[in-house]
Amino acid sequence: MRLRHKPYAMDRINEYSHIVIGNPEERAGSWKEVFGNEQPIHIEVGTGRGRFMYDMAKANPHINYIGIEKFTSVVVDALDKLIEEELPNLKLINKDAEDLTVFFAKGEIDRVYLNFSDPWPKKRHTKRRLTYKTFLRNYEEVLVEGGEIHFKTDNQGLFEYSLMSMAEYGMLLTYLSLDLHNSDFEGNIMTEYEEKFSSKGHRIYRVEAKYRTEPMQ
């Protein structure tokens, strides 16, 4: 996907620095102070234009959310939603998720969302997939003990790879759907991509995976 350059993006982001948090590494261990409360914190890695995080934050004011998106021209669209209607329980980070363990202290996050991540289908790009073992290790480091990953995609190959990667890492798969929109799952909040792909008849895959608190026997 070609991203359209938006020359105003950085100025807009800098103007609303209370929403798009600059230097997030300086906030590690103090995100509850940023939000001003003790509510649990959920993050989305690759938040895109922010529809999912926005709708989640609006539906769940008792939870704090942070959307992480590395592309400035994309995260500014998420910011524009919040300029129109600011939600006190939603912040954004315009950085690469590879640095996740620098942004958050150990055990600071309660849940990680991965929605319609780039599948990186070529074998030589396997390490870039957000469910590759190094990313799983980073999520585990910032999550509370027994923390969860909730993952959705329309890409069967990526889904199968992710199930294998999570299982090999020793995670527990606590929920699995091979056709989310025709399942009994309640309360699904869609992303922009999810709405687009499902309207074309694409099957949506979903898994919830939990880190073990005790080593496998």
UniProtKB/Swiss-Prot annotation:
The gene is trmB. NCBIfam families: PRK00121.2-2 (NF001080), tRNA (guanosine(46)-N7)-methyltransferase TrmB (TIGR00091). This is tRNA (guanine-N(7)-)-methyltransferase. Its EC number is 2.1.1.33. CDD domains: AdoMet_MTases. The lineage of its organism: Bacteria, Bacillati, Bacillota, Bacilli, Bacillales. Substrate binds at K122, D154, T191, E192, Y193, E194. GO terms for molecular function: tRNA (guanine(46)-N7)-methyltransferase activity. Keywords: Methyltransferase, S-adenosyl-L-methionine, Transferase, tRNA processing. PROSITE patterns: SAM_MT_TRMB (PS51625). S-adenosyl-L-methionine binds at E44, E69, D96, D118. The keyword tRNA processing applies.
